Amino acid sequence: MIKVLIVDDSMVACGIVKQMLGTSDKFEVVGVAHDGKESIIKTKETKPDVIIMDINMPEMDGLEATRIIMKECPTAILVFTTEDVARVGYTAIEAGAVDILPKPDFDLKDDRFTQLFLHKIESASKALLERKFDNGVLEVSEKTDQKFKIVCIGTSTGGPVAVQNLLKDFPEDFPIPILITQHIEVGFDSHYVSWLSSCCKLKVSLAVDGEVPQPGHIYVAPADKHLTMSPAASGCVLRLSDEPPVFFLRPAVDVMFKSAAQVFKQDCLAVLLTGMGKDGGEGAKSIKDAGGFVICESEETCVVYGMSRAAIEAGAASRILPLDKIGKLILSIAQN
């Protein structure tokens, strides 16, 4: 069973979280804490697999508690917060939390949210907290002479920090447009864009239907919309779709990758990073089969080795690299 510690100053919230966890036999609540200081003590006492962490609490907030826990007793932390403090939630992710999930109105009749909530906790429980990075020189064999017109990045659990690390050294004049599909909830996409903008030199915005992607610009798929593209005289225009979810996900990486394969073929560079599940595996294979280039994050640096693994097992990977080398390879390709 997955051992869960609930941290929230609201007794009502704690009770409802317990009820949601009780709908599955996969989870065991090993403790409840009502402020950040208590959460540190309970973490050391109960040794949970996952901590569900609120942000706004007395004594010590969830942000400071996350920093201390990740320093003293690293544990998978799922930030469970309201939209008005979502920006702080991404700071918590930067401090080491695995994922973020907005609090609903606690309507237990919403089975979809309950399933999403349980999926997030299960995904967090699989997180690799001590990731290894190799900062060595990029080998010549890892380079490619292909020229690309679009970079498409797909990720889920652990994605915000992975993308931040990937893009942090990209110059503002990076010569290729970048599209990102990050599994994200409604109400949090704009906060994600704002946070990512503060972490890199490139322009970052939510993708807009009909927009022409520009070099040095990052376009993020909005929550609950698939990001696709269609051919145009300029190369392509971005499209947002309400097509059904894939793997219960919208936006889905598979949808973006398959669209990129159709429009750009061999001119597409795809990157599949950390995340639970198989989303992106089929789409990555489509890009590879069309002549494009697919980079998959290796197991050693993935927070959750699921999506990247699916692509590798499908035979879609052109290169399998640790996170820090992916950024170096993309920059090397762009400079050529």
What name fits each language-model region?
Residues 2-5, 11-22, 26, 37-45, ...:
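Conserved acid/base catalytic micro-environments in cytosolic active-site loops
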Residues 34:
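Glycine-rich phosphate/oxyanion-binding loops and their immediately adjacent helices
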